[in-house]
Amino acid sequence: MAARYALGLPRAAPVGQMGTTLSQRAGSSLEFKDHRSYEPGDDLRHIDWSAYARSDVLTVKLYREEITPHLDLLVDTSRSMNLEGSDKGGAAVALAAFFAAAASRSGYSATPWLLGAECRPLAGGHRPPAQWPPFSFEHRGDVTPNLPLFKARSTRVLISDLFWLGDPLRFIRPFGEGAASATVIQLLAQADVEPPEGQSLRLVDSETDEVKEIHIDAIAAKRYRDNLARHQQFWHDACRQVGAVFLPLIAEDVLAQWNLDALVAAEVLRVR
């Protein structure tokens, strides 16, 4: 079923005749591939003067860099992403592998990144997902907002539960800067969304190991759901400010059904 999907085409870049995505910026590769019409602000060194002499129309040469789209895929490695008794960790890895495979089917190059105290490339991430090393969800505390310099005009996807403190814009601004498209997938376990009402629980903070005994009555459950909805709205608003897509998914539903209609509706994916 997963093979039905390819990455959606970024709205910020037109579709080329070769079936890949063309950036509006001039590339630096020496390998010439195609033309497009001149636009104000284009590098004059890339104008095809021979074509202009023949047609009296200004055109710009496109190079391989401009027609090789790229996916930057960030996976949150916080301890909360591997919630005990849930499928969240497995779903995060499965989604990462799915996006990498969809990128390959779409003619994209891809770089998987591990997000924690720093944002670093996954060792062996250039290989097929089946050959990736195991993911380790061991980071404690907030993830770094100091992101690397991603490839210009890349498609960017973040997979995280977003259980971070602070203003979402502190992360989402550098994440979306210069991207062809940016998508934030909030991956939650069912237990993250619906606390077990009417039960007494022994909770262990995944970040600090602090232990707390609590009873979840109807009032506490409603307070939790309201706080989660407020947190999600903060992230939704931040994403909208920078032109990113925000999508919540439930880990158990992803693994059981692979229903990705929400990603297709948001044009993050397309059906081949």
What spans do the regions from the language model cover?
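Exposed, interaction-prone extracellular/peripheral surfaces
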Residues: 1-24, 36-45, 51, 60-272
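Glycine/proline-rich, flexible active-site/cofactor-binding loop segments
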Residues: 27
